[in-house]
Amino acid sequence: MMVTRTRKIHLHPRLETAAALLNALPENAVVADIGCDHGRLACALLQRNETWRCIASDVSAPSLEKARRLSANIGGEGRIDIRLGDGLTVLCRGEADAVVLCGMGGERIVELLDAADSPLMGARLAVMQPMRGVEELRAYLYISGYRILDDRVTEEAGRLYQILSAAPPCADGERDTWPADFPAGCFSLGYRAFERREPLCRTLARQQLLQTQKRLKTAANTGGEPVLRRKEAELLTILERWEH
């Protein structure tokens, strides 16, 4: 019986990267995993950080029941609060130090952030992993004044994913600024990953360039061509400056 209670939870690369972006949180931190599915991330965090507590929420009652069973298997029942609900509405202001929004579309993440009564419901950090719609998410974060803290690219099952962390807007309204060698206004890739010259970021830039150029072949003289031309120019600039 002790074997099941101490079984280490394995995370796939996307969630492992999300967990890494939470490492700077202090002791006794509270992490809210919004859209937790079966609760693997929350339970893994409890195993790795003995003083942390987690809030695991989802709109699916069957998923939450699986999360409840998993937390019981690792002996984490007393440190996890499982809640049925949608988005950040399950939180009271200030009760979580960090919120996690992984495995959903970027547009959906924007909806959940925008529907909150206050930015991140008082949390100091958000970790986000959009399955798609990353440009829409980054544009929203920039326009709303969120500050990008870190950016990662990870590979899972042959696909590249972007995972980013952000802090809520400053009271003075100051916005993020792009590095001098990164195209201002580029939302398709993360400039933090570019600054570190993260190898998978370069691979992703090449993939996006090929996809953009393929779309341009059928977008000539259409309303979408200028946007695609701009994206192509941004990606070419990133790749040209990579070695500098």
Question: What does each model-found stretch correspond to?
Answer:
Residues 28-37:
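Conserved class I S-adenosyl-L-methionine
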Residues 60-62:
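Conserved SAM/SAH-binding beta-strand->alpha-helix loop
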Residues 65-93:
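S-adenosyl-L-methionine
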Residues 46-47:
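Gly/Ala-rich phosphate-binding loop of Rossmann-like dinucleotide-binding domains
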Residues 39, 43:
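Glycine-rich SAM-binding Motif I of class I
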Residues 96-103:
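Short SAM/SAH-binding signature in class I
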Residues 2-20, 89-90, 95, 107-244:
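Class I S-adenosyl-L-methionine
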